[in-house]
């Protein structure tokens, strides 16, 4: 399936299941050798290391302007935590053996903007700021970047504008970081963006432009608006390699976090990482970093709402960004606002298709159930998008075809580590979180 023949595509049995909003799990029929998979993009390990070096240069500045980063010396990072009670209760709920150990990656509680977007979004703003500052002679690569916290630097950056299209969290991270540096910022937000996120941005002086349409329209309009201003830099969530590399740094850093927790990752102790997927930049970048750090022993699996399975649809059909969920009759309406994306990134889909084991869809009903369980069992509050990874553990443990295709035996499954990548929730106001929990009842 490589041409857009919608009629033929809609006869496919998996597409029929997607059209019916069913929860499905689809995986690549056989694993691609990692060396081959990594060659699908021109990006390399050196590019990820360059991104980490840039974040290190900015650490003194970040530590100075964000009090919450003082304890980490300006490093934006989240912890991994064991979730044994969640594992016990979910295993009973799924009627599966509680194999391996379950962990949660708390990007939901990343400092500054409380979501995974604090990685890619903030990194791209910093990369752009550095480029401008170096060119203007405000800093050199050897300087302490904390000197960018000055009226002179803010005045300089105010001559420039940053624009982005977002369903919410990316706009939040880019808006907060850009405003702190002194940039003028416009965030073009889709209809499904939460009101509190818009209110937060406006309180920082960010220009929020609202659309009655979905994410794709917000991005397109943001791109058009930026074209008319030569001093406006548009952050393109669909195609940005800079965003992608900002996320990839997390993959490299996770390796050390696993070592610190005495978590073994090798042929007999596989690591399964479950990543919620919207347009694809966040999970794609993280997976790219993970594959460079841990090789074939890490299995990355993407989770999408039943109403918005854009990456699964793009990769499965081979059409990537040439097809959207509306083409098969889906409405792209989900409580998981961060995942309400109708058309996947073609760049990410093509770059990562041989490195991702599989893709599954999850209903809003299950999302709310897992929000409730995570709150009750671990006292961790997450937004709907952030719990999408939970259902993946069920698929890995019960899908015999997947286990055979990826040569996973009973001992490996017993020794496995399952990491649910929680993508957001830390900045959700208490009254909004109560609404989520009420919907779970």
From Swiss-Prot:
Cofactor needs: pyridoxal 5'-phosphate
Question: InterPro entries from the xrefs?
Answer: D_Ser_am_lyase, Ser/Thr_Dehydratase, Ser/Thr_deHydtase_PyrdxlP-BS, TrpB-like_PALP, TrpB-like_PALP_sf
Q: Give UniProt keywords alphabetically.
A: Lyase, Pyridoxal phosphate
The protein's matches in Pfam families, at most eight in alphabetical order, are given as: PALP
Keyword Cell membrane annotated: no
Q: Set out the biological process GO terms recorded for this chain's protein.
A: D-serine catabolic process; isoleucine biosynthetic process
The organism's superkingdom is given as: Bacteria
Q: What pairs make up the disulfide bonds?
A: none
- Supply the PROSITE patterns for this chain: DEHYDRATASE_SER_THR
Please write the reaction equations for the catalytic activity of this protein.
Answer: D-serine = pyruvate + NH4(+)
Q: Which residues carry this modification: N6-(pyridoxal phosphate)lysine?
A: 117
| Molecular functions (GO terms) | D-serine ammonia-lyase activity; hydro-lyase activity; pyridoxal phosphate binding
- Name the EC number(s): 4.3.1.18
**What's this protein's family per the entry?**
Belongs to the serine/threonine dehydratase family. DsdA subfamily.
What's the name of the protein? Probable D-serine dehydratase
